[in-house]
Amino acid sequence: MSAPPIAAVVIGRNEGERLIRCLRSLQGQVQQLVYVDSGSSDGSAAAARDLGATVVNLDLSQRFTAARARNAGLAVLENGIEFVQFVDGDCEVDPDWIATAADFMQAHPKAAVACGRRRERFPEVSVYNRLCDAEWDTPVGEAKACGGDALMRVVAVYTAGGYREGLIAGEEPELCLRLRRAGWQIWRLEAEMTLHDAQILRFGQWWNRSRRAGHAFAEGAALHGAGVERHWVAETRRALLWGAALPVAIALAALAHPLLMLASLIYPAQVLRLSRRMGFERALFSVLGKFAEAAGALEFYWHRWRGSARGILEYK
């Protein structure tokens, strides 16, 4: 089986040495290397050109989203490119990944997306980095969605209409949902894919990342929640229940009788319940994260009610 033409689209802003490491890891693995820059001030665009990448400078007069950046990279792919590897600029691609994923895709013509194991480069640096590493350890086999790093079949992405550019987060699961509706498959392979440098060292960074997830849940449910997949409906409801409705109900009950404040013990009880399945650390932050997710979901509803759109929610 002959090797298919493959490109890579890398997106980033001010990633510095991480971007250089990312682009170098792709050299020799792809026939076309594209870097989409969203307003870097650290010389990222020039460094990418020096490494042989086609550089696209995103028009920042329009609202920025990662989805817009990925579509901009798609738009400059050369004719004949069969697969495209999407990568975030803070990731390093495993030297065997693209060949492994491309072989799988060629052997499975209904596969539109293949992703592998994304690992955190420095999980020992912070609890938040460890949480990211655990989050990316998803089951092997046919899947519902991928993350930001994945090899995709170009014709499938084009016919699906590309990424939904208005989404500030959750753009990959939304695209995967449309691909699956069109009869395509999403696969998680048992193979090393990328090393990611999350650099989440402070609670505030983790909180904003969780807020962004809650916003994505609510927006995804608003877009596709009525479908048979019930896209992110359960995730949104859990966030709003544990992060908003229950705290308000407990506070109001405590106004009637202070002893009813004991109902708040449901939270440590939930941590202990989840600890049996995921360990104490992950369970604790899973419960804490519901407050941040609820904040993000409520923020989405607030902006939708006002007829406005929220800008990107960054955590680095």
PLM features: residue spans?
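Catalytic donor/gating beta->alpha subdomain of glycosyltransferases that bind UDP-sugars
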Residues: 164-167, 173-229
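Glycine-rich, basic loop-to-helix element that forms the pyrophosphate-binding segment
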Residues: 60-79, 144
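A recurrent flexible, glycine/aromatic-enriched loop bordering the glycosyltransferase active site
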Residues: 119-121, 135-152, 159, 168, ...
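Short, well-formed alpha-helical segments that are part of the catalytic scaffolds
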Residues: 11-28
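Conserved donor NDP-sugar-binding/catalytic core segment of glycosyltransferases
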Residues: 92-127
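Short beta-strand-to-loop acidic/aromatic patch adjacent to the donor-nucleotide binding site
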Residues: 80-92
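A conserved acidic beta->alpha catalytic loop
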Residues: 25, 37-46, 91
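Membrane-embedded multi-pass helical conduit in multi-pass membrane proteins
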Residues: 241-307
